[in-house]
Amino acid sequence: MNKPKIFIDGEAGTTGLQIYSRLNERDDIELVSIAASKRKDADERAKLLNSVDVAILCLPDDAAREAVSLVHSSQVKILDASTAYRTAQGWVYGFPELNPGQREKIANAQFVSNPGCYPTGFLACVRPLIAQGILPSSFPITINAVSGYSGGGKSLIQKYDSFHEQQKGATSDYPFGIYGLQFGHKHVKEMHQHSGLASPPLFIPAVGDFEQGMLVQIPLPLWTLDNPPSGEEIHQAIAQYYQGEKFVQVASFKDPSLLRDGTFLDATAVNGTNIVQVFVFANDNTKEALLVARLDNLGKGASGAAVQNLNIMLGLPEELGL
């Protein structure tokens, strides 16, 4: 039996390198690579793109669109890691745990878009509550999130690594900073479309002086609702939604042992995995709650999710290589 052929277009980038590393040791697939001197040769890329079973695109948005235009074979499946097609018609959103039946859609699709890191954490928290009517679709959602600097790609990684090397590991001039202050972050559209919310969420991302890891925080002012759910009801709804899932873990409710020193929720605790953890914190007296997702921005937020989707697209056990 022939092994499925996989081509990573953009394997030299941050996400591409991570995916290559996860796939390179596997003996159930065949990785096809392009010579470094041919990476910008459209004819050579088109030849490879049309000769494989699955092409994984790890490219900027415009380059991803160009790559898709080069594929003429209906036998080639495409998994795109850019933001170009995450809300596009004809593309299946590659978050297997998003809805019942999402895996089947991914398995049967020719075109699959890999989710963004922030949306993965956000949707893992919010989608179950909207889908089950625990929160109304009109609920005003705010997101505060922080990612390690690897989320900024090679240029930001080099900036931080250079400073750490010069200062022998000292904290950089940018220990923490918020951005996206024009409220036009590229992830908002997919957050809105795939959550079921009536209006886009207000999203404030940040970067911290640590390489990998992510916390996505969603405060819920439940006092704005006529009949607000309790913290336990929120936790129960999310836990039931993900019952039996391998890669979405819902933390125990009110368990201080999950916090570092009983106080802090560490952004880096699941680095190197394809897991997103969901936490629910609540005070029923004040009718306030906080949802938090913790994930590796390069794992379930990027390359891990891509490998999971690839496995589903090939009809393989989705935990292979993870």
From Swiss-Prot:
Task: Please state which protein family the record places this protein in.
Answer: Belongs to the NAGSA dehydrogenase family. Type 2 subfamily.
Oxidoreductase listed as a keyword: yes
User: Which terms are listed as keywords in the entry?
Assistant: Amino-acid biosynthesis, Arginine biosynthesis, Cytoplasm, NADP, Oxidoreductase
What SMART domains would the database entry show? Semialdhyde_dh
The annotated pathway is: Amino-acid biosynthesis; L-arginine biosynthesis; N(2)-acetyl-L-ornithine from L-glutamate: step 3/4
A GO biological process of this protein is: L-arginine biosynthetic process
Biological role stated in the UniProt entry: Catalyzes the NADPH-dependent reduction of N-acetyl-5-glutamyl phosphate to yield N-acetyl-L-glutamate 5-semialdehyde.
Assigned EC number: 1.2.1.38
Write the lineage as a comma-separated list.
Answer: Bacteria, Bacillati, Cyanobacteriota, Cyanophyceae, Nostocales
Note the InterPro entries from the entry.
AGPR_AS, AGPR_type-2, NAD(P)-bd_dom_sf, NAGSA_dehydrogenase, Semialdehyde_DH_NAD-bd
Q: What is this protein called?
A: N-acetyl-gamma-glutamyl-phosphate reductase
Pfam families named in the record: Semialdhyde_dh, Semialdhyde_dhC_1
Q: Where is the active site?
A: 117
- Report the GO molecular function annotations: N-acetyl-gamma-glutamyl-phosphate reductase activity; NAD binding
Q: Gene that codes for this?
A: argC
- What organism does this protein naturally occur in? Trichormus variabilis (strain ATCC 29413 / PCC 7937) (Anabaena variabilis)
PANTHER family from the UniProt entry: N-ACETYL-GAMMA-GLUTAMYL-PHOSPHATE REDUCTASE, CHLOROPLASTIC-RELATED (PTHR32338:SF10), N-ACETYL-GAMMA-GLUTAMYL-PHOSPHATE REDUCTASE, CHLOROPLASTIC-RELATED-RELATED (PTHR32338)
- Catalytic activity from the UniProt record: N-acetyl-L-glutamate 5-semialdehyde + phosphate + NADP(+) = N-acetyl-L-glutamyl 5-phosphate + NADPH + H(+)
